[in-house]
């Protein structure tokens, strides 16, 4: 599932508005790749709501590690919570929207990959879990949460996922950017008059924005999004979340912690020079 890919670069995707594409479909009476590109971009923009952004900036990513804060099993308090909020809100590198479109992969050394641990059991809402109490474990858990929610193509499933995996004070079924993204995608496909929809959400790159103590991590995952109706459109979508370690009878699990969603990360086509320059590293699966 994970790993660096070296493939022939697809042709550039036209940057048309969703309204323009839908007008074209009405006039032509066909459902083509152009609509699919619009659907993919719809998800991309839905994952960038106003509450999910904390400012601009450009260039390299602002990775940060803080040694304060503690509290497995709670949302944190005092200076620890302040440090978590500051880390989550810290702006990340910003790129042009076109960076999310398929592009030529880099020939430069990508650096050491991030090895994601394997799940050891299935958790609430059918989400793989059992990841270790490490930054890599937090990243693997975030990837699993997003994959199950988005690939389901079901708002009911997405609601259940975030309800089961977010702590009180965190994203809800009504506010989570993942639910908003899926709702936008489903709205467009219903407008197109088809129920034949397949979504593949593959984590290919990632970075750890920072940590606060051993129990709080802000991992960021850069996914390849493939949306198929009659043809397939592809794009990149990135997500960062506050991941907080919670102990339980089975040892513990990473959950989405309380507070506003972190500043928006760069959604960059994986393995490009730009993806590497903003701090992303390839993801590989532990053997």
Give residue spans per PLM region.
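Short, solvent-exposed mixed-charge patches
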Residues: 285-287
